Amino acid sequence: MTDVPATFTQAECNGDKPPENGQQTITKISEELTDVDSPLPHYRVEPSLEGALTKGSQEERRKLQGNMLLNSSMEDKMLKENPEEKLFIVHKAITDLSLQETSADEMTFREGHQWEKIPLSGSNQEIRRQKERITEQPLKEEEDEDRKNKGHQAAEIEWLGFRKPSQADMLHSKHDEEQKVWDEEIDDDDDDNCNNDEDEVRVIEFKKKHEEVSQFKEEGDASEDSPLSSASSQAVTPDEQPTLGKKSDISRNAYSRYNTISYRKIRKGNTKQRIDEFESMMHL
């Protein structure tokens, strides 16, 4: 309440009673002032939710920090006393840190900071569009460069007046060349085989004639020697025996060689004429 200055008369100051009118005016003024100064109807104003949440979050953080300090001190003591429980304590510390992080995230979400972290959907779409444009630009440039290179190559071909051989044409030409070389080699082998067969047949025929002549000579020599001749003449010297053995060995070797060579030629796939020649030689 405020003190209201009042004007008093001289009689009041001297101790005499003031007049009644003066008292009435003073009382009226005081009542009006009291009415003016009286407070308006009081409404209880509750604190905002944000203020309460911030206070609660600060208190929870302080409690968490205090708990962490206590836990760290207890863990140090436990490590000094029981070093075997290190693994369990480390696991517990990791869980405490994870819980602390989750609680902090929840508090920031409650306080309303989540709108700063989470961008709007429109901004996300704009960012994606910008990224797509950035990625599409180099692709378009590469396609344009490829088209330009192809156009330059076509112009060069037209100007030169010929077409560059492709990989398929090169492969076909190589294959044709290999086939020609292979055919030529086969023809050469066939010619060589024919010549070799003819030479071998001639050699064998010459050897057979030589063997027949040698046999006739031996028979003539045997007929000239009479049975009444001396034992010395009838006895065969040891030098003559190996010569006879050598001649027979030569004939056998030649015949076996002919058989093996002709059989080998037949196995290679020669003509029917060669087979007939071989059969005729076998019957001789």
UniProtKB/Swiss-Prot annotation:
InterPro entries: Ermin (IPR045346), Moesin_tail_sf (IPR008954). GO terms for cellular component: cell cortex; cytoplasm; cytoskeleton; extracellular exosome; filopodium; glial cell projection; internode region of axon; myelin sheath. Residues 225-235 have a biased composition (Low complexity). Binds actin. The lineage of its organism: Eukaryota, Metazoa, Chordata, Craniata, Vertebrata. It comes from the Eukaryota. Residues 126-140, 171-183, 201-220 have a biased composition (Basic and acidic residues). Pfam families: Ermin. Residues 184-200 have a biased composition (Acidic residues). This is Ermin. Keywords: Actin-binding, Cytoplasm, Cytoskeleton, Phosphoprotein. Gene3D superfamilies: 6.10.360.10. GO terms for molecular function: actin filament binding. Residues 265-284 are annotated as: Binds actin. Transmembrane segments: none annotated. One of its GO terms (biological process) is morphogenesis of a branching structure. It is found in: Cytoplasm, Cytoskeleton. Plays a role in cytoskeletal rearrangements during the late wrapping and/or compaction phases of myelinogenesis as well as in maintenance and stability of myelin sheath in the adult. May play an important role in late-stage oligodendroglia maturation, myelin/Ranvier node formation during CNS development, and in the maintenance and plasticity of related structures in the mature CNS.
